[in-house]
Amino acid sequence: MATFLRPELSNFRAYSTPTSDSLPLELDYLDTNEFPWDLPTALKEVLAQQYVSTLASHRYPDSHHWPLRQAIARYVSEQSPTEISPHQIAVGNGSDELIRSILLATAIGGYGSILVAEPTFSIYGILAQTLGIPVHRATRDPDTFAVEIAAANTLIAQAAPPVRVLFMLQPNSPTGNPLTAAEVDWLRQLPEDILVVIDEAYFEFSGKTLVGDLAAHPNWLILRTFSKAFRLAAHRVGYAIGNAEVIAVLEKVRLPYNLPTFSQVAAQVVLDHRQALLAEIPTVLAQRDRLYKWLQSCPQLHVWPSVANFLFFRLREPQHTPSLWDALRDQGTLVRAIAGGIRVTIGTPAQMERFWQRLQASLNQQKSTDN
């Protein structure tokens, strides 16, 4: 490895997705928790008209995102007992950019470390490692996936450099479980020198939010995204909600002109039409509950309940998990192999039917091979 490159990156594992040349041409993508349907054609036509009539391609984007921040603040205020100001909103090129800004603002250069509870979204630890920030990994109960709070407190007490940021996904991914009352109480009792980041990427599916706690906890920050329920994964729009002082610092450390104009316009358009878009969420949840019952009926599997748009299950003979992933991929269904199990995104009814048929065929094939 070249001497000008940091040596700890030589064996570093980046966030990975399957390469397109290794996949079948016709594929059901049930691995990234995207919404099963694209934006309606009518909304795409609205966006196209915006591009033609108002978007100046030779101009840099609005670096302050002010109209979008105002629109987001109005939306979040609908879920908050107190009004949320645009000054409490930061917008990023996906939540990933906001996570990186948080790390730059809090823990880089030996100033601090972070705490995560695994299994969880891997990008928290990945981005911290790319910045040379130590990552402390708390454990979860193997049956419920609730954080083992006593062990987490021990990590916090012993951490050097000190824990500056705790990342908590609500509900958690890949497991789909919401925060328990005990976990929320624990977060509320953490010292104010720890930034508590609550990632609500799946809020629109779970209906669970802690935005009402922000006023009482200036060291809390909530992350959300337009990539899931709002169907803008291709546009990469995430946002943070928090104390205006913290938001101002995040604005200082991010790149200028970080979000393309078209992405800003798209986010405003879907917010303007949110009632129609979010009205389809019950259909997704019904598909999730149906698949959960199917998976429960399968003796080879252990499936966990979920309040998000995905389900997590493990094989009772976990050594077969890699071959199951391969078999599903070869039949045309891509899922996420993670945390010793499989996470499957809730897709269209047709995709769910195909997944179930392919899963049964794969499990039957494994059973016959074992015999």
UniProtKB/Swiss-Prot annotation:
Alphabetical list of Pfam families matching this protein: Aminotran_1_2
Q: Could you confirm whether the keyword Acyltransferase appears in this record? A: no
**Which GO biological process annotations does it have?**
L-histidine biosynthetic process
According to its UniProt record, which reaction does this protein catalyse? L-histidinol phosphate + 2-oxoglutarate = 3-(imidazol-4-yl)-2-oxopropyl phosphate + L-glutamate
Q: Which residues carry this modification: N6-(pyridoxal phosphate)lysine?
A: 228
Query: Which cofactor names does the annotation list?
Result: pyridoxal 5'-phosphate
What are the entry keywords? Amino-acid biosynthesis, Aminotransferase, Histidine biosynthesis, Pyridoxal phosphate, Transferase
Q: Does the keyword Amino-acid biosynthesis apply?
A: yes
Instruction: Give the record's pathway.
Output: Amino-acid biosynthesis; L-histidine biosynthesis; L-histidine from 5-phospho-alpha-D-ribose 1-diphosphate: step 7/9
GO MF annotation: an example: histidinol-phosphate transaminase activity
InterPro entries referenced in this protein's UniProt entry, alphabetically: Aminotransferase_I/II_large, HisP_aminotrans, HistidinolP_aminotransfase, PyrdxlP-dep_Trfase, PyrdxlP-dep_Trfase_major, PyrdxlP-dep_Trfase_small
| Family in the record | Belongs to the class-II pyridoxal-phosphate-dependent aminotransferase family. Histidinol-phosphate aminotransferase subfamily.
What HAMAP family does this protein's entry cite? Answer: HisC_aminotrans_2 (MF_01023)
Task: Give the record's subunit note.
Answer: Homodimer.
Official protein name in the record: Histidinol-phosphate aminotransferase
Q: Whose protein is this, by species?
A: Thermosynechococcus vestitus (strain NIES-2133 / IAM M-273 / BP-1)
